[in-house]
Amino acid sequence: MKFNQFSYIPVSPETAYQELRSLGFEVSLDASAKANFESFVRKYFLFFEDTDLALKNWIADPETDLLSFFQSDRPLTAEVFGLVALQLLGFVPNVDFTDSVAFLEKMAFPIAFDGSLNNLHQLLATRTQSGNTLIDQLVAQDLIPISNDYVFFNGKSLATFDTNQLHREVVYVETPVDTDKDGLLDLVKVTILRPNVDFPVPAMMTASPYQQGTNEPSSDKLTHKMEGDLLVKPAGKISLSRPEIKAPEADLTPINPVTKAEERFAHTDTYTLNDYMLARGVASIYVSGVGTFNSEGFMTSGDYQQVLAYKAVIDWLNGRARAFTSRSRQHTITADWASGKVTTTGLSYLGTMSNALATTGVDGLEMVIAEAGISSWYDYYRENGLLVSPGGYPGEDLDTLTEFTYSRALLAGEYLRHQKDYEAYLNELSTAIDRKHGDYNQFWHDRNYVQFADRVKATVVFTHGSQDWNVKPINVYQMFRALPKSLEKHLFFHNGAHVYMNAWQSIDFRESMNALICQKLLGLDNGYTLPTVIWQNNQSEQTWEVLDNFGHDNGKHIQLGKSEASIANHYEEEIFAKYGKAYQSFKDDLFMDKANAITLDFELDQDIQINGRVHLELRVKSSTNRGLISAQVLEMGDKKYLAPIPAPKRMSLDNGRLFKEEALRELPFKQAKYRVITKGHLNLQNRKDLLSIENVTPNEWMTIGLDLQPTIYKLNKGDKLRLVLYTTDFEHTIRDNSDYEVTVDLSQSKMTLPY
C-alpha cells in the first residue's frame, strides 16, 4: 500500500484541537505530545474497558510494549509515533513490516512528525489498510452517536445519519418531451433514498438507463455483422446545423397535491459512492429516464430529448417541474425535503448523462462527477469516417444499445400498446446512424455535447482510464479541454480500463468527493482545493501525481524509417475466420508481429512523459480506390505494468456504519511483455477532416494525419516503443477481407509524441 492523500485539508492548531475535542478525544493544548498521544490511542480502543491490556499488546519499538512506553519517562519520537500510527492504521508488526521507518518511507506516509495535535488530526484523516480513513472506522464503531444531523471533521461529513430509517419513495416527474408522440408529456420514474430528517438535504442523482433493467436478448438479436466490404463513399462536404436545446415552459399547476409519496420500494441497485454520502446526509436519486421500465416514452439514446427528461428531475427538486405520485397523474407532489442542490454520479452511460446534463446549465446542478462518460456519441461508435465498435463489443451500435435499454417493453402491457410504434421508430434510428458510410452527420451532431461545453456552470470532476477502449479517452480529453477556462474542473486519469475507482486502496477518491460535495452542496466553507489533474503513474504501483493539464503542445518527432513498406489487407480464409471468431487472437498476433502489419521499433533517447495525442504524419498510397489505416503504439519489454482491471483485495470498505460494505480494490502491478499506450483508426477518404470526403486514387501518394487516442504515459531513456500500422482491426473496425495493399513511405512519415 502507498499513501496518496489528496483529501486532507491543513488546519490551524486551534482547529485541530477543537475538532479532536468535539469527537471526544481528551487532548489538551497544555499537555505534552506524549500525554496527548496516549489519550488519543486509549480512545481508539472503543471496545475495551481495560485499555492497559490493549496497550500491552502493541509495541512502541521492537523491545518495548506500548503500555511500558507510556509509563516510562521516554519522550515521544518520530520513530515511536510512526510505529504506533502503523498499528492504528491496521498494519501488523512482524507480518506487514519489520522495519517501520523504511516501511513508512516506502508507503509515502503523509504525516511529518512534530509532536503537535495536527499530527493526530491528520492521522484521523488518513486511510487505514482496510481502505477506510481512521475517523470513518472509529465512527462506524460508534465513536460518536447517530444524530441524523451533520457532523464535520476536516471539512468532510461523517456517517452520522441513520441508514436503517431511510425514506424510500418513488415519484414520477413530468418531463418537457413526448418521445412516443402519444400526446402526453413523458413521465419518468424517480427512485429516492433520503435521510429521515426535517431539514432540506442535497441530492446525488444517478441518471442510468440500466437502473430498472435491460432487454439483453432482444439487443443480442440486433448485433451487427462486422464482416463486409469497406464502402467507397461519394466525395463531398458534410453540412450540419446546431441542435436546439429548448424545452417548453413547464406547467406547475398542482393537481390534488399531497405531501407523501404513495409508492415505496424495498431494494434498488445503488452506486456505493452515493451510499457513502447517503450515510453522511446526502439523498440518493436514481432515474432510468424515457423509454425504461415503469417510465414513459421511447429510448432516444443520447439526444437532448433524453437529457431534458433527466434535467426535469433537477427542475423538480428546485420547484420548476411537476411530479406525480403515480403514472395515473392524479396527485402532484413537491420535493419539500430537497435543498435543490445536486451532483450527478456514475460511470459509462451514467457518466455520459452527467456530461450532457452539465451542458444544459441547469440551476441547482452544482457539481458533476462524470466517470468514463461519452462526450460525443460519434466518438463512441465511429472514428474518422469509419465504423469503430467500442472495445470488447464488436457489432454493437446505437440501435442495439437502444434495444438494450428500452426496458419499457419488458412490461407486457406496454409492449402490447407501444411495440409497433417503437419498432417503426427504431427502424428510423437504425437508418439515421448510417452504418453504411460511417460518417459524421446531423444524427451524431445532435448527440455531441462538446459543442455546448461553454454552457457548463457546475464544478466538474472527471475520472477516466488510459486503458478504456470502450469509452475511449478522446471523450474526456475533448470535454475537459472544451470547458470554459474560468470553470473549476478536475480529472483523475488512471491506468485502468472502463472501471469505477471509488473503492481503490491507493487513492482517497471518495474522501476527496466528500470534501468537494460538502463545499458545493452543503455550503461548507472548508477551504478545500483539489488539483486540476491527478494522474496515476504508469511506472510504479499505487503512485499518483499532480499535473497541470491534460494535453501539451511540445512534441518529440520520430522519423519512421528510410524505405517503403506495405500492409496486405487480405488474410487466408482460415485465419480471417479465426480472427473474427476471437479478436484477442488477432491482437496477440498483431502485437508480436505475426499479423499483416508494418511493425516499427524505436529506442527512446530521452526521458519523456507523453501528455496528449500522439500524432502520425504518414505518406501512403492504396492499391485500390479505398482503404483504412489503423495504428497502435505499445511499450515493449518484459517487466511489470499496471493491469487494467482492479483486483479485489478484501471485503473491508464500509460506506457508513456497517452499511453497503464492498471490496477494496487496486490495479495489480504484473509482469507482462508489453503495454498498449494508444491507438487510432482512419478512413483514407476522410484524410483531410471529419466533414470532408475525398476520393482515393489507386496508387497515388497521399499525406495523411492521424491523431491517436489521448493519454498520459511516462517513458524513460532506453525504453522501447513499438508502432504497429495495419488495416483491419478485428476488435474495432469493419472486417473487410478485400485483396488490396496500403503502402507507407517511411522516409516521408513521422510520429510525434506530445509532452
From Swiss-Prot:
InterPro entries: AB_hydrolase_fold, Galactose-bd-like_sf, Pept_S15_Xpro, PepX_N_dom, PepX_N_dom_sf, Xaa-Pro-like_dom, Xaa-Pro_dipept_C. Gene3D superfamilies: 1.10.246.70, alpha/beta hydrolase (3.40.50.1820), Galactose-binding domain-like (2.60.120.260). The keyword Electron transport does not apply. It catalyses: Hydrolyzes Xaa-Pro-|- bonds to release unblocked, N-terminal dipeptides from substrates including Ala-Pro-|-p-nitroanilide and (sequentially) Tyr-Pro-|-Phe-Pro-|-Gly-Pro-|-Ile. Keywords: Aminopeptidase, Cytoplasm, Hydrolase, Protease, Serine protease. GO terms for molecular function: aminopeptidase activity; dipeptidyl-peptidase activity; serine-type peptidase activity. The active site is at 348 (charge relay system), 468 (charge relay system), 498 (charge relay system). It holds the Pfam family Peptidase_S15. One of its GO terms (biological process) is proteolysis. Belongs to the peptidase S15 family. This is Xaa-Pro dipeptidyl-peptidase. The gene is pepX.
